[in-house]
Amino acid sequence: MENKKIGSLGEEMTCSYLKDRKFVVLEQNYRNRYAEIDVIALKGDTVHFIEVKTRCSEVAGRASEAVPVSKQNRIRRLAEIYLADNDLCDKHVEFHVVTIDLHDINYAF
């Protein structure tokens, strides 16, 4: 499966999970020229910025290892822009990394 399709699948799974738990998904793939935030969701008075990492194998490393500090900093700066542009600076903010390791599913049955 292509990396882009794998990533899209993980993001869709994440959005479905969030919606089932009464989150409002505000954005998917919000970006500027320096960074991208996979999912931005709102629940109550908290805005959640979510990086989704999906893997089909461990060849490229585990999904949880794929968000270096430099990327975290770019996401944080883009989140600040998003909050200001959308008049959400009064909201609480949380950052999350959702990891989906699809290769584990192969061995579930």
Go through the PLM ranges and name each one.
Residues 37-59, 75:
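Conserved catalytic cores of phosphodiester-cleaving nucleases, focusing on short active-site segments
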Residues 20, 24-47:
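Active-site metal-binding core of divalent-cation-utilizing nuclease and nuclease-like domains
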Residues 6, 21, 31, 100-105, ...:
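Basic, glycine-rich
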Residues 1-28:
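Acidic-basic catalytic patches of nuclease active cores, encompassing PD-(D/E)XK
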Residues 85-109:
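Domain-level recognition of nuclease-like catalytic cores that cleave nucleotide substrates
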Residues 34, 47-49, 92, 102:
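Structural motif
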Residues 56-76, 85:
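Mg2+/Mn2+-dependent nuclease catalytic core
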